[in-house]
Amino acid sequence: MLKARVITALVLLAGLLAALFLLPAFGWLVFASLICAVAASEWATMLGFGGASRHVYAGILGALCLASGTVAGLHQEATVAPFGLAPVYAVSALFWVLCVPFWLRARWQLPGRGAAALIGLVLLLPPSLAIAHLRLLSPWLLLGVMAAVWIADIAAYFTGRAFGRRKLAPAIS
């Protein structure tokens, strides 16, 4: 299992590095939008959306990411500073800081698929735009942020394997 994970990670890393350093700004924005669409498809599956509705939702979020990034200027090289992203990032930060802790503590159930779809928008669109934005600032900066996340994830995995007695989030893992 670990060997397959490592091989998969190396193949994906090679593709990511090629895209990160070789694609023009618009190509990277398209790449980030595709990542957003794939994540939206996964979110829709967790919500119980089936077949066409899952693909439509994923397509809408991917297109919205591409359109928002283009309007913000993320499709151009670094000569133009992106604008209009602060409110998007602020809404996301407020959601994570003010809503998510209470949501998890109270174990709130989503009121319906429509509300869950809107929450997916708040969960998926800002990070996708941030990936495009950080790459515009510096591919090395984005790679550093991603590496920090990867290192933390790998450390948590091995720490859990070595010292974990019970799962902290059995509903997730």
Question: PLM features: residue spans?
Answer:
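Membrane-embedded alpha-helical bundles of polytopic integral membrane proteins
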Residues: L2-S173
